[in-house]
Each structure stands twice: as structure tokens, then as C-alpha cells.
Amino acid sequence: MNYLENDIFTPDISTDKTPTVYPCVKTEKNKYKVIEAVTEQTPRAIAFANEINENVIGDFERETDKMCHVSTFCFADNNIFVSYYANGYSNEENPDFQSARIAFAPMNDIKNKTVLDVQCVGDIISGHTVKKVYDTILLQRDDDKDNIYVLFTALVDDQYYRLYRIFNIKTKALGETLVNRFKVGNAVNDFSTSGIKTALTYNGIGYKSMRSDIGIMQKLTSRIENGKKYYYTGAYSGDFNCIIKSDDLLTWEYVAQPVEGKGAFPNDTLWENAVYVTDDKAYYFIRQWEASIDENGNPIKGDNRNEQGCLYGILTVYDLEKREWTKPVLVGDSQSRSDFIMYKNELYLFHAPINRNHIGILKINRTDIEKSEVVLQADMNGSCFYPFVQYDTEGNIYMSYTVDRKHIRISKFTFEKYISD
């Protein structure tokens, strides 16, 4: 990138250190506790699928959208706010034609929704051209209830960046586009592909190969550190994934990754990593992909491992006090984004156990994750993937999900039905 006067983008910190790039390594099933996916449909699973399909509160894409994906939502001021990305030109998930979106509607009149473009391909930012748009989320700080932070990925000139715009709930207006920052130790770079690599290398920290899209996960949990509230979540790019934290949702600090530190283990993790912090521990779940790729994202010649995905995701825990990873558990899983939620002081994982037509709920045993138990694994009778589960202001629970990449859909459900004996 050619940096301009008064540019919002900044050069990376310089370092002479040689990067350490960790390989993708197959997770041997016989070395770990395994929680298998099951296809048998229990009455509980059937009831969950029926409730989700019958209690749809609305779809939030534009009628003219031909593709939409990756939803996040929140409630404020008697409205629901939903983020996603969409393609209005073709039915492909193609960042060359995608826009980052925020939609909102009154809870008592969902059909009366407004949809705003947050960023589109072709837009000019600080003199630079947006060439691709990808993963889009929305976040809120506990001490800033009037604003929603809309974070998204864009290829600007020749590099992917994490960018944000602040949406004011009262005025329904979006602020200017600015750049998130990525901090490792004392190194602070733009939150970009090179910014991540350089900041990690500067601090002597390795990473797995990165490619294309950079993501930040949609679920925030918080922890007080030295009198300051930090919000935790996951970040990822290709095979690289890590825990990050922030006190302002603008600058994100690196915390840990499963291939580094005490208890680190080799893995084939890929893309979205669900993170939930409670009791000074970060619970962590991520899908895997059994194919080795090089630094440029190309398959390594001679690698004969499965290139069609992996049947197991990884469940582990990172102790924030001891800075140590727990031995992982392999959970039957397909290729989808997952999400944790706390309900009545119990932690649950929502994921895709069989394929993207199934939703599974796993009760996490926080004393011993190897004793975690399947609540249900439901055939949703159609496309239902990338679940995100959230409370409204009155304690009701909703789930957003993608349907065939045609709809951003949200349903209300009663959790208690599925965990009671």
C-alpha cells in the first residue's frame, strides 16, 4: 500500500526476526477423548428443530439479495439490529461483489426493517479502493449503550484489513470507516494480514498459515484485569486462529493460540474459533480441516490427507491465570461456525455435528471437558448453519442462522425445554 497524507492506514512495525510458521498437523483420534456425532433423532432433537422452524421472527436480508451469510444480532431501544454480508449480483459467496450490512427493525414490527450498506466493493476509503468485502459482525460495549460497533473485513488496495464503523442507535447513522489495530506486547499494527504476522514475529511468536479473509468472532465475554474491563473473543485467518481481547473494541490484543505456550498441541484448526470466558478460563471450540497448505494457501505436494474436511472439531480450555491449554476433546463436527452461551450458570456449545442441516447442543462440563455431554443433535429439516445465540433485554433467547445462503433468519426458542429431565 502507498500511504497517503492523513491516511487512516499505517505502516507495520519493522522487525529483522525470521517468522515461525507452524504446519497443519492431523489430530490423531486415538490420542484424545472423542464425543461422536449421532444421526438418531431423539424427541428432544425433533422438538428443537420444530420450534426453530415454527418460531421464526423474521428474515433480514434485502429482497434483492441473491446471497447472504454470517449473522450477528443484538437488542437495544426496542429494536433488533442484525449484521451480515450480502451479494446482490449473483448467488455466489464472492467477496468481489459483497457488501457489509446492518439491518434493524422494531421488535413489534419486524417487517418494517431498514437495511443499510456499511461498506461496498468500489468504495474509496482515505484515498484507497475497497476491492473485496467479507466477514461482518456487530458488537456492543457495556458502557456505551448508544452505539453499535460494526466490524468487517475488506481488501483495501492489496491487503485485507479489519475495519469498523460506529452506528448510533438514536440517530440511526453510521460514522466514518476506520481501522482496527492488532497489538502483541508493545507492537501495535493495523489489524491486517501483514500487521498480524509482523506483530507476532516481532515478539517471537509463531503462527499457522494465513490466507484471504480475517475474522473476528461475534460473541463477547468480559473479564476485569487490573481494574479494567476487557472483552474477549476469537480471531482467525485461514489456519491461524487465536484468542484476542480489547477494552474499547477498536484495538485488539493477542492473548494465546493452541499451537503456542504451555499445553500447546498440534492441530488442523481452520477459520472460526468460538471463545467464551468465565472463571478466568477461555473455553474454545473450532472446526478442523485435514489438508496441509503452505504460507500462500496452496496444498502441499505429496500430502495425501483428506482434503474434504474433518469429522471432528476441537474443544479445549485456556487458563488465563496459568497461561496453559487443556488437553483437547474431539467433538463430532462439520464445517460451520459455532457459538457458546451461558444458561442458568451452565455453559453450552451450539455447533453443526453432522452437516450444515444439523444443529447440535453440547453441555460443557467446566470441571472436566472430557465429561461434556450431548444435549441434542437435531436434523433441522433443511439448511440451518452458522448459529449465533443471544439474549434479548428480557432474558428471552434467540438464534440467528443462514438458510441456503439465501436468508439471514432469526428464531426464538425456549431453552428450558431441552435441558430439563
Predicted regions: what is each one?
Residues 3-4, 8, 16-66, 74-131, ...:
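Beta-rich carbohydrate-recognition and catalytic domains
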Residues 383-387:
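C-terminal regions of proteins
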